[in-house]
Each structure stands twice: as structure tokens, then as C-alpha cells.
Amino acid sequence: MKDLLKFLKQQNKTKEFDGIKIGLASPEMVRSWSFGEVKKPETINYRTFKPEREGLFCARIFGPIKDYECLCGKYKRLKHRGVICEKCGVEVTQSKVRRDRMGHIELASPVAHIWFLKSLPSRIGLMLDMTLRDIERILYFESFVVVEPGMTDLERRQILLEEEYLDMLEQWGDEFEAVMGAEAIFSLLKQLDLDHEIAEMREELGTTNSETKRKKLTKRLKLVESFHQSSNKPEWMILTVLPVLPPDLRPLVPLDGGRFATSDLNDLYRRVINRNNRLKRLLDLAAPDIIVRNEKRMLQESVDALLDNGRRGRAITGSNKRPLKSLADMIKGKQGRFRQNLLGKRVDYSGRSVITVGPTLRLHQCGLPKKMALELFKPFVYGKLEALGLATTIKAAKKLVDREGGEVWDILEGVIREHPVLLNRAPTLHRLGIQAFEPVLIEGKAIQLHPLVCAAYNADFDGDQMAVHVPLTIEAQLEARTLMMSTNNILSPANGEPIIVPSQDVVLGLYYMTRSKINSLGEDMWFQSAKEAEKAYRAGAVGLQAIVKVRMKQVHIADDKSRTETTNIIETTVGRAILSLIMPEGLPFELVDLPMGKKQISTALNACYRLLGIKHTVIFADQLMYTGFEYATLSGASVCIDDMVIPTTKKTLVEAAEAEVQEIHEQFQAGLVTAGERYNKVIDIWASANEQVAKAMMENLSKDTVVNSKGEEVQQDSFNSVYMMADSGARGSAAQIRQLAGMRGLMAKPDGSIIETPITANFREGLNVLQYFISTHGARKGLADTALKTANSGYLTRRLVDIAQDLVITEKDCGSEDGLLVTPLIQGGDVVEALRERVLGRVVAQDIIKPGTKGEVLIARNVLLDEKLCDLIEEASVDQVWVRSVITCQTDFGACAQCYGRDLARGHMVGQGEAIGVMAAQSIGEPGTQLTMRTFHIGGAASRAASENNIQVKNTGKIKLHNAKFVINSEQKVVVTSRSTELTIIDKLGRTKENHRLPYGAVLEKQDGAEITSGEIIANWDPHTHPIITEVEGTVQFLDFIEGLSITKQADEFTGLSSTVIIDPAQRPNAGKELRPMVKLVDPQGNDLFIPGTDVAAQYALAANAIVSLEDGAKVRVGDAVARIPQESSKTRDITGGLPRVADLFEARTPKDAAILAEVSGTLAFGKETKGKRRLVITQANGEAYEEMVPKWRHLNIFEGEKIEKGEVISDGPESPHDILRLRGISPVANYITNEVQEVYRLQGVKINDKHIEVIVNQMLRKGTITDNGDSAFLVGEQAEVARVVIENRRLVAEGKAIATFDYQLLGITKASLATESFISAASFQETTRVLTEAAVAGKCDQLHGLKENVIVGRLIPAGTGFAHHRARAAAKAAELAPKVEETIVDTGTAEQNLADLLNAVDFGD
């Protein structure tokens, strides 16, 4: 009983804790954990197999081997528990204490802890302000260090070599003290006066000017302060006592054949003990210094190896040449403690088997093999057998079950009814990878899976396996049923669209039955109901695709749930009429009155969910599936070789292309085109030939000519099986059919470049040997890619989950007024993503004003936009909306529901406790395997787009120019003179229809604000040269134009005109290196002219290779080109695509040759140049100048004297997200990352809601750099959690003190995960050693806010159903801490009664 009480008491102790603190262990602490000192390296006696006394497995120290039995066997049984045997000294207790009793080793000489020594930055080095190199020399006995200078002229911490030390000894005698080894470091650390050090450093920080010194001081100050605050003492980084792990955690297992398998730790401990004992003996014998030193060094090395083998020097290896696994290796990596045992555990009550199709199942069911079910539900069956009296004991029940009699199966049926099981398919990439189903018992050994959930599991039936888990407790069953049931997971959390969508054969069947066929049996018949039409079809009186008239009854359900019935006669087909029979009431017939491809089916299911709710949708989906299977069977669609019709025009098209190629080759031979041009042109020719063949083939396949009932020939969609499969979306695509019946087209070489000769054959004709060989590369690459992709995609998901795991919805509304501005996504003349798709399910941040009114509010702020409101927005032609976003949410920890908006998987406002972070990570990571791995070489076909030279508009409307600088030339046309000009076309309702970037020097046909009709060409420019445009009228004057030094004259072969070319400075003779050729504009009197509106002279510096076609003294008008700079034909840049691009964006990597943005607003000028760089000087409005050095090879977009805005592009290139954040702010960087990531997914046809990407961006912006610390404890330049700074500032404001200011910092996902507040979460992610070292030194306390930390300590997570539990715990704790007032008055009677009750309740046993 006592044991039980003790046990219960212990249980309570560990349960209630609010945080986990990590720190350095002091020697006293290690001794207090220990149950005795391990003195001998022996493990167990080889004859008796009993543990040796005082050895590594000693029973005296660590506890008995067998339960309640001492080693010598004097005391056995439970009644002796707690007795310590006087003979062998072993306490009689449970043997499991050997898992938690520790021992210790008293080290004969102190030893430095390798983590604090070698884990960079070295903590010991920082504390002592010495270099790691020096410290190692002291530790490993190469030099002395002065610990007590005394009255000498030596400095404390000065390093002395052996000879120097001897000299000093002669000079000063024993006035000073210098030591080597860990003792020296120990005494130096012990001497540190932290308060004094901190004061000194703070003072120095105020006075120092050098940046490097300040950085170094800040680092050291943070470390010393964290020691000061955390009650860790610096000298504890040196070990004097070494703890010994409990023996059952480093077991010694007997193998058969009398050998033993042992944990590597035992070897490592043995080494330490051996060397320690030898050192003790040597010290007792007063051995020569050099021997003792060597032994001490060896001891240091063996302790290093025990703690972290291989960190310093060569790893110690065991007998089989494999490095021994040290304590650090035990916890880090995929196989370490964190990831193997704490985050991922194996569970009981589970089984796995192959899956097969269950076409007859309902959506909420799965087929479970009887054998498996019996095994999984055994305990329940036993219980039921006893309850029914069929078995008296568990043993008897067991016998019955083993016999597998009839009554057992009946009972199993009863047990299983209404008891859901979880089905999981690895890899579980998103939360739909585990769903709950009700089991149905089946014969056989394979699990049956409902076909509609295959998409969510990404399962197919080619041998996939799935695992079954049984939720045991009633709570678990409830959760499985209400949250995880497959019927509750109809919408995908990634984009809010149905994921339970029929595919493949079902789609084909539905498509086949909803197609119409001209002149089919029974055309133009009239039916009084859909039922009658079905009857006629079953009787064979009418064909399935016949066009007939049917009387349809339709129910319309209004918003207020009122129903109106309408009956009318509709012309439709028999198949669609039959399909209408399975539609739920209230769904409009228009949804199925068309050929049902995959898209249309999805639309119908979506509409059903929004109109009628979840129950009807599930039934409808099931019925669709049954019907689809039935009619797919009836259709008899199959593929035969004649279905792949080769177009007759193919031969002529190929021949024409070959002739063109021949012509190009002849031109190349004659030297008229370069090799590169020939290559590009040939590839263009073949690409377009391929397109034409494909087009001819599709036209041929998709239409049939038939005779209608009137005897006329008409075209109808073909019933060719191959075409039907592709058209319905069941299987295959136009691109694949092209390879079957068109031509295979161009192939790539292994290095990614395209081979000039295409494969003109297709698979139906067959390939010859060469063609086959060329195409093998593609097949091989596909397989290699897939393998790489899976690993990389998994790693991306892991990093995303890790950064976002602690983001949970914690409150209803944070009251934030901020948000992001959302506009439709338009590229060129196409709307890529309409506004409604981007704002659906978001909350409005600022009132939406109806366009064209003076402030009539269309939708007020804080309203959730649903489908109806989005229709309203579209009708009113709103073209931008401010929506709330997680990024601007002001909740301290977590986010609020209003800023997140709709829960995509449920279709209503998100609830509290929803783990939006993990959901976002899964939604982005799950499609990762569909993305490509390769980088694209843009060459050939793609580079044509780069050299466009005009803009042709596709819509009618008004022109609007944004951030445009332009001049009007002599012909009254607009000439653009800035680089970031955008031209948008706006329709009558004020909606943006298209937008285009205009290059510098483009000539516009119309002015800003002019009307334009579609098809007009509005802007022209020369794509091959870059003009320099004048902004004033005047006379040209050349400066620094010296022939042969800075310029050369060239005459054009064709025209005979001469032009001046500027020589590249690198190629000029030395005399010309410093010349800066310029064109200057002067008035007729020779005075300088100024650029209008400024006092900057109108002079244009000319870049290398610029061509000037004017003569000195020529007159120029506004908008003329003074010079032209030839553009390199746009080089084929590799575009990083697919997965690597997404990873780069989330890691916030600065791209190579990033764009240079203006740091301040002002006027630009050039300062003095250095060897490889130019000096840009931007003069601000207040006269301050900002300087920046730019490499000379960078092509600048801006001329001297131009005004630029902060954040404007000075030199082109990919923009760096860090620059965007610094110069333009949070909203633009969020938009940039969101759009760029979406771009990659859009190319693959994957839809992900913007919200998810914003959630990740929000987590990347968690940290800020302190710019001014005000009255706070932060240091300037320190990186701090934004939430902490905000909370601290709130406190400072309340106290009327100065607040701290900070700049947001964008961290990549790996960096941000490692920089989380929670050290447990960071350590379980990556770089375990570094994270734990840092945390221990700082004495960090993990508050257990996130999900990962709680999983690791074995609690419910603070999300989902665990959220309420944590809330309740917090509330209870607050109530406990609240000052108790009334309860103090207790009358003695009740107190006595309570005490008596308590005493009676507890039975103290013997």
C-alpha cells in the first residue's frame, strides 16, 4: 500500500509543470543525482554473470537485477521491500530503478566539457575572451596560462610557452602562478566577477566606435548576462564530476554462444574510468610531470569521446572500425532520441495489409478482413464473451477466440458496429492521409478502400499497403467519428475545393452517359418524367445518347430554406435524364445538362456542398460513383490501334519543315546566319511544325461527320475512345495523344539542351533505332527525377512544418485594422487569377466602397466574404479589396480567427484551436512531389517572347500609365524615360483588364487617359538596342571623345553612314582609361542646359559599346535618341523552376546578381570611381548624401540627374526579398513571396490558397533587429522575437518609459525554425548539439507553447481538442494563483470532519 501511495504521489508530481528548464549541472547536483561512485571499469563477472561491485553495472549503486530480490539472495519477496541487505548492500526494490538511478565518477583532474569548448562560437572562449586556439593549447598541455600575476608585470590570462614559463620562474620565483590544463581554465572561470564584467562592457559599448568591436562586445555581453541571470556559474563548463547513465539505458545483452552485445557507451565509460584510475595512481606516486600531463590529456580526450565522439580529432572506433556512438549521437539525427522515439512512436492495436477496390462500399465504410479485425478487437471480444457468459475467464475466452467458432464472429460483428477505425497510407503528406471509416467485415486478406478517397490518400491499387489503427477510448472514438470520418473531409484544406471527386473510369462512365449523339435510336421522343426515360432505355426503345424532350420537376431552395417547385419540358439526352434521378432535391438540372467531364463533376459537387450541405453531398458523390462505374462498363470504351488516327496532312507538314531547315542550313553555310541563330531558328521551325501536326490530329480525332435525321451531313464530337478519355479528363492528355498519333517532336539531351533533329515518328508508326535511343534519355531522367523529388519534397515539408507548428488560432479577433491589398492577378493581357478567387473566404479589413459612388459602403469591414458577397463584388466591378491577413495580425502568440478567415476544409469561419500553421505547411508541401526538379534552360522556342517589340492590346478601354516619366517628342508621341513604367488598360467600369511593362525608350501612339480599342498596337520599341533619350532641346557637344583612346569610328557596310562607338574601358589604352565620354546639351550660346525642373546639367554619360550616330554640334529635339546601347541578345538564363525555386523563396535566399534598389529617395549622381566599382551618390531632399558602390559591369537603369524613389530599381536583376522588406515594407514582401510561389505551383496546375503561404511568411517575419533599445533590456543590434518586443513595449508605455524600436527581419525557414523561443522544438529539428549548448548556457526555460514540445513531453497538444484542455489548465492555474480572501474562515468542525474523512480514506497497510 505504501508503495502505491508513493507511486501515486510521484505520478502527481511530474504531471503539473509549465515549462522545462535546461541549465549547466553543478558538481553538487551531479552528486545529488548519483546513488554511488563507479570506481571500477568491470561490468559483469564472466563466470557468474553477476554485476561486479563498484563496476559499471553494480547492483549496490544502481539497484537489484531481479524484482524485489537482493543480489546474494538473502532477501526475496515483497515483504522485505526497502530493506538494504547487509551482505551485498543491495536495496530490495523493483528492478526498473536501474533505468533511472544514476552513478558518478569523481575525476582526478578537471575536464573541459567539449560542447562548451568546441561548439561554435566557443562559450568558454567567449567568457574568457580568449581564442579557441589558445584555450586548446592550454587544455591539451602545450602552454601555460597566468592565473595569478601577483606583483609581476605579467597579465592575467597571458599565454606562456614552456621556455617562457621557465624564464619567468627564474625571474620572479613563486610570485606569480601559471598553470596548464583544465585546472587553469577552471580557476580563470572561477575568478570571473560577472557584475563587474557586465558593467565594464556596457560602458565600453557606449564609447566604442568600431563596428567589429561592437559586434564582439554585444556577443560577449549577451553570454555573460545570460550566465548572470540564469544562476549558472561559468566554472560549471568544466567537469569535475562525471555523471554515469543508468545501466538499463546502456544495456549488456547476452547473445547465444556466450558472447555479449553491449552499448558503445559502456566502452566509452570504461575508457574514462581506466584512465581516471591510472591518473589517480600516478598522482599518488608523484610521477614525473610529463607522464601525469599525458595521462590528463588522455583523460580529457576520453571524456570528450564519451560526450561527443568525433567532435575533436579522430573519432574513437570500436573493434569493427566503426566510430562509437556517444551520448550526443544518441539524441541527434533521424535515428536519435528526438525524432525516433519522442516525435514518432510505434502504436499498438494496429495492422497493415494490401488494399483493393471496394466499389460497393459507402463513402464512410472500409472493408476489413475478418482475421485482422478479430486480432485488432481481441480485448473487446474477450470482454463481450465474458459479459454474455460464454466464457468464465479471460483464459477461456482466449481459447474460444483461438478456435474461431461461429459465436466469435457474431460477437465480432457486434463489437465492430459503430466503432470507427483509422486508415493511414504512408507517406502521410497532409492531414487527409489518415481518415476514419466504419469497418465492414469481409473475407480475404486485403483491406477494401472506397475509390473516392484514393485521391486524398494518393493511393492506387498496384500493391499499395495501408495501416489500420483502432481508437480505443470513447473520446478517441468520438474524435475519429466527428472530425476524421471520411464523410467530414470532403473539401481539401489546401484550396477549399472538393477532394472527393470521381476520377478515371467513373468520369468516363458519366461522360459517356451525358454525351449527345445525332440520329440515335429514339431521337425526338417525349417522356413524361426522367423515370419513364430510364424505363424506355432499359427496354431498349431509346439510345442512351438520344436527344429527347423530358418533363422535369425541379425544386429551388431559397436562402431562407423555402422551397419552390417548377415543372417544365427540357430538351436533353436520355443519359442526363437518368443522371438527374440521383441528384439531390434542390440542385439545379443545368449542372448535369452538359457532357460531364471531371471539371463539371467537381463543379456540381461543390455547388451541392454549398447549397445543400455535407450529408447530401456525400450521398450524391456515392451515387455518382456507382452510376459512373455502371455506365463505364456499359460503354465498352477501350483502346485499339485504329483509335489513334494519324492526320493525312502530317507528311506534307513534315516535308515543308524539312525544306525550311534545309534553307537555313544553306544560309549558315554561306555565313549569313551564326551557329546560334541557326540552332534557334531550326528549333522554332520544328516546334511550330509539331504544333501544326498536333492541331491537325486533334481536329481529326475530335470531330466526326454524321448524317442527321433530315439527311444532312453535320459535325459532332467524336466517340473515339482515346479522344473521349482525354476530353473527359479520365486519363491522358492532348500532349500524350500527340505522341501516339502526331509526332514525338523535339527531345532534350541529358544536359538539358534541345537536339536539333526531332523525332518525326509517333508511337503508332513506331520509332527507328536512333529515335528510340534519343528518347531513352527522357525516360531515364523521369525515374531519376522522381527519386530525388520525393526526398527533397519531404525535406521541404519538414522544414515548413517545423517553422509553422506553433501557429494556432488562439482568439476571435485581435482588432487589427491592417491588412493586405488584394488585386486580381494580371499578366500581360490575361487575368491569371480573378479577384473573387483571391478574396473568397477572407475578412474585409477596410470598408469596400462601391465604385462610382461618393462613399457608399458596399461591404463593411470585418465581414467574411462568402460566395454570395463575392458575386456582389464582381457585379459592382470592384477591382481591389483590403483583406485581413495573418501577417498583420496583432495576437501575441498565435493568430486570430478574423485575420485568418474561412477554414477551407469546412467552409465556415475558422474555429479556435485550429492548427493553421501545420495545415499551411502540409498544403504547400504535399503537392511538392508533383513539382519538377529541373532548372529550365530558356533557349529556342521560349526566347522568342523576350524579343517582342510592341504591345497589342486585347481589350477595349482607357490607357493608364503608372509611375511613368515621359517626354512628348516632336511628333507629339509619348516617349517613356523611366524603367518601372507600367501601362494598364481599364474598362468602362474601372476594372483593370491588362497590364504591361514598358521598357525605357518605348514610343506610345496615344497619350495617358486616351481611349483604345482591342487589337490596336499601342507601343513600339527596338528590342535590340537601348536608346538614351534627351529631355531638352539643344545642341550636342561631345566631351572626352578622343579617337583611338575612348572612341572608334565605324562605317556601316550597307548604308555607308559612319557612327561613333565608345570603347569598353577594359580594352582602352592606358591613356584612355580615365576618360569618361559624355554627350552634353548646350543652348546656341554654348551655356549648359538643365533637365527641366532640376538644376542638374543635361549630360549623358555613355556606357561601353554605345553607338552615337549624331555629329558634334548637331541639333536635337526633345524625345530624340542621342545614343544607342546594343543589347546582348537576351542570354539564355537558367530559370530555376519547380521545387528548388519554392525552397529558395522560403529560405529567403538572396539571388545571384540581385537587383540593386535605391536605399533612399533623391537625385542620383556618380562619384569617384575605384578599380572595379562605380560610386553612386543619391542626394536626398534635405541635402544629405547617401553613397553606394556598384560593380561596373552592372548595367544601370538610371542616368545622372534622375530623381528616384526609395525602393526603385537602379540595376535590373531578380529582386532580393530582404531588400523588398527593408525598402518597401512588409506587405510588398508578402505579396512578392506569395506570387512567386504561386507562379511555380500554377505552372503545374496545383491550386493552393494564398493564406497558407502568408502563414509561412508570417513565421519568417517573427524576428526583428533592435534599432533603439529605449528603456528596455534589449541590446541595440540584438535579434529578438517581435512578440517579445511588442509585449515589452506595452509594459514600457504603461510605465511611461521610452519604447524599443526594431526593424523586421526576414529569416529563411531553416534559420527561423532554429531561432524559435522553444529550444526543445529547435533541438528536435536540426543542429541538436548547437541548440542545446546555447540553451543550457542561457539557462533557457521552454514554456511549451508549440505543438512539438508538447508531443515530446507527452501531453495533449494545444490545438484542436487539446486546445480546450490547455485553456482549462491555464484557467485553473490562474484561479489557484489568485489571492484567496474569503476561504480563510473555516470552522473547526468542518476541518476536523475533513481530516477524519481523509484519514479513513487512506489505508496505511502494515
Curated annotation (Swiss-Prot):
Parts forming coiled coils: none
Q: Which SUPFAM superfamilies does this one have?
A: beta and beta-prime subunits of DNA dependent RNA-polymerase (SSF64484)
Biological-process GO terms, alphabetical: DNA-templated transcription
Q: Which residues bind Mg(2+)?
A: 460, 462, 464
Q: Which GO terms describe its molecular function?
A: DNA binding; DNA-directed RNA polymerase activity; magnesium ion binding; zinc ion binding
Cofactor info, note text:
Binds 1 Mg(2+) ion per subunit. Binds 2 Zn(2+) ions per subunit.
Instruction: Output the Pfam families linked to this UniProt entry.
Output: RNA_pol_Rpb1_1 (PF04997), RNA_pol_Rpb1_2 (PF00623), RNA_pol_Rpb1_3 (PF04983), RNA_pol_Rpb1_4 (PF05000), RNA_pol_Rpb1_5 (PF04998)
Reactions accelerated catalytically: RNA(n) + a ribonucleoside 5'-triphosphate = RNA(n+1) + diphosphate
Q: Which domain of life is it from?
A: Bacteria
Cofactor requirement: Mg(2+); Zn(2+)
Q: What is its EC number?
A: 2.7.7.6
State where Zn(2+) 2 binds. 814, 889, 896, 899
User: GO cellular-component terms in the record?
Assistant: DNA-directed RNA polymerase complex
* Entry binding sites for Zn(2+) 1: 70, 72, 85, 88
Q: What does this protein do?
A: DNA-dependent RNA polymerase catalyzes the transcription of DNA into RNA using the four ribonucleoside triphosphates as substrates.
Q: Which family does it belong to?
A: Belongs to the RNA polymerase beta' chain family.
PANTHER family xrefs: DNA-DIRECTED RNA POLYMERASE (PTHR19376), DNA-DIRECTED RNA POLYMERASE SUBUNIT BETA (PTHR19376:SF54)
Q: Which HAMAP family match?
A: RNApol_bact_RpoC
**How would you summarize the oligomeric state and partners of this protein?**
The RNAP catalytic core consists of 2 alpha, 1 beta, 1 beta' and 1 omega subunit. When a sigma factor is associated with the core the holoenzyme is formed, which can initiate transcription.
Its protein name is: DNA-directed RNA polymerase subunit beta'
